[in-house]
């Protein structure tokens, strides 16, 4: 499947402070954030004009699920548009607090852990064909996903009883199973709950919940692009060396704690391999696969950055990727800060900087400031992101949903939508079932819109 439907769901951390002290509970902050949403959507679970879903998840975490995308840059753009949607809610909520005489600064963090040790996720979705053994996909994918943090982790300062240490991944410490149907209790690497949001006879949806939330556009593109390419290779019958892990949960932590990528992890059958070895194998197969697939500039960029990042890890010369890979960008920032102020990694100011890197408010968030200075590379533009706040992807089913929502809202009609249904809540209760996520034109939807 060279053209694949993909999406990213991001849960955001939330807090509200007043002169540096916590002002409101996360529950209260979430209610203020979603008050505007509830006023027009009559719910804290809504679909937007750009085809995305916005809702309040378990534990008062705002969650944004992008619409269906079929290219990497399109997905990165719509993922960033989610930040803008949440930032608009933040600004509105702060104004409401001010109007009510409460005051306070609201923070939304695109990260994966809070100071209390709770974790919230960034879930990737990939449409895959129903035919074929799911177990083969998960067997080949697991070693790749366990070691993928080497190229696309968000970076984190981990406070241990002995000392503070810098790790590749925020999410690695919170994963407890390899493949499972749970998402919160056991937090697997791959979630097997079968909800295709498409024709279930043809497709299933691969739900990957191990990844970090990324700030750098290039890292997001690398994270999703490499996974999609590995899936494509599995579907094409590419043979990989067997890197089945003896204990994926121990391995994911060991990889996260080793910035050199060279520490051996134990494979099934007593063999050993390093994260670098494993990633090199997948990358080598990808380079070969490029020669057999249709040319695609975005996929070629992903394979090039993948190789360059592995070279940087192997040589420990990160200047090759220090504007493109989140954990490298963040580590360089910390090192400069430590050198300038002569402080240890365990200093509370570093922990504050770690959090501020993920603050999505423009002009305040540290990553945004780095990006403005040209210290973080880009794959999309502010103009494209702004357009994606209101406009759905034009090449997938998201266009049908977005056009329907826009038309219904402008006509003042009551409606209900989900990923596959578009329904007018009138006497006739007319409903269109859109089972093909690749289809952006549908006469039934056009007739439904025309009838308004």
Swiss-Prot record:
Binding sites annotated in the UniProt record for ATP: 53, 66, 419
Record field: catalytic activity: ATP + [prokaryotic ubiquitin-like protein]-L-glutamate + [protein]-L-lysine = ADP + phosphate + N(6)-([prokaryotic ubiquitin-like protein]-gamma-L-glutamyl)-[protein]-L-lysine
Residues at which Mg(2+) binds: 9, 55, 63
GO molecular function terms listed in the Swiss-Prot or TrEMBL record: ATP binding; ligase activity, forming carbon-nitrogen bonds; magnesium ion binding; ubiquitin-like protein transferase activity
Keyword Transmembrane helix: no
Active-site residues annotated for this sequence: 57
InterPro entries per UniProt: Pup_ligase, Pup_ligase/deamidase
E.C. number: 6.3.1.19
Pathway: Protein degradation; proteasomal Pup-dependent pathway; Protein modification; protein pupylation
One BP term from GO: protein pupylation
Family label: Belongs to the Pup ligase/Pup deamidase family. Pup-conjugating enzyme subfamily.
Role according to the record: Catalyzes the covalent attachment of the prokaryotic ubiquitin-like protein modifier Pup to the proteasomal substrate proteins, thereby targeting them for proteasomal degradation. This tagging system is termed pupylation. The ligation reaction involves the side-chain carboxylate of the C-terminal glutamate of Pup and the side-chain amino group of a substrate lysine.
Note: The reaction mechanism probably proceeds via the activation of Pup by phosphorylation of its C-terminal glutamate, which is then subject to nucleophilic attack by the substrate lysine, resulting in an isopeptide bond and the release of phosphate as a good leaving group.
Listed name of the protein: Pup--protein ligase
């Amino acid at each position: 499947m060279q053209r694949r439907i993909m999406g990213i769901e991001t849960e955001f951390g939330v807090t509200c402070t007043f002169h540096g002290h916590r002002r409101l509970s996360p529950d209260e902050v979430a209610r203020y954030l979603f008050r505007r949403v509830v006023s027009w959507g009559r719910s804290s679970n809504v679909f937007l004009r750009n085809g995305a879903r916005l809702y309040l998840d378990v534990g008062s975490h705002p969650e944004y699920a992008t619409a269906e995308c079929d290219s990497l840059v399109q997905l990165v753009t719509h993922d960033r548009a989610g930040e803008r949607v949440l930032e608009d809610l933040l600004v509105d909520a702060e104004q409401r607090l001010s109007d009510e005489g409460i005051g306070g600064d609201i923070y939304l963090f695109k990260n994966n852990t809070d100071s209390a040790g709770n974790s919230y996720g960034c879930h990737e979705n990939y449409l895959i064909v129903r035919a074929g053994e799911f177990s083969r996909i998960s067997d080949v994918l697991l070693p790749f996903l366990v070691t993928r943090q080497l190229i696309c982790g968000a970076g984190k300062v981990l406070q241990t009883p002995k000392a503070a240490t810098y790790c590749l991944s925020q999410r690695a410490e919170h994963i407890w199973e390899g493949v499972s149907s749970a998402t919160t209790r056991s937090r697997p690497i791959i979630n097997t709950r079968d909800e295709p949001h498409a024709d279930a006879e043809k497709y299933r949806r691969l739900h990957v919940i191990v990844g970090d939330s990324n700030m750098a556009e290039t890292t997001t593109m690398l994270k999703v692009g490499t996974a999609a390419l590995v899936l494509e290779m599995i579907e094409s019958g590419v043979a990989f060396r067997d890197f089945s892990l003896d204990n994926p949960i121990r391995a994911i932590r060991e990889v996260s704690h080793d910035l050199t990528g060279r520490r051996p992890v134990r494979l099934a059958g007593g063999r050993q391999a390093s994260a670098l070895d494993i990633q090199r194998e997948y990358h080598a197969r990808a380079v070969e696969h490029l020669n057999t697939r249709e040319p695609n500039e975005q996929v070629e960029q992903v394979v090039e950055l993948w190789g360059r990042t592995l070279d940087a890890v192997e040589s420990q010369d990160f200047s090759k990727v220090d504007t493109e890979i989140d954990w490298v960008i963040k580590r360089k920032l910390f090192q400069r800060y430590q050198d300038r102020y002569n402080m240890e990694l365990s200093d509370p100011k570093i922990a504050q900087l770690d959090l501020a890197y993920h603050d999505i408010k423009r002009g305040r968030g540290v990553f945004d400031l780095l990006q403005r200075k040209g210290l973080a590379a880009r794959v999309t533009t502010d103009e494209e992101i702004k357009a994606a706040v209101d406009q759905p992807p034009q090449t997938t089913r998201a266009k049908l949903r977005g056009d329907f929502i826009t038309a219904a809202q402008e006509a003042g009609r009551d409606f209900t939508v989900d990923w596959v249904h578009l329904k007018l809540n009138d006497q006739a209760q007319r409903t269109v079932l859109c089972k093909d996520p690749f289809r952006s034109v549908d006469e039934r939807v056009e007739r439904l819109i025309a009838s308004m």
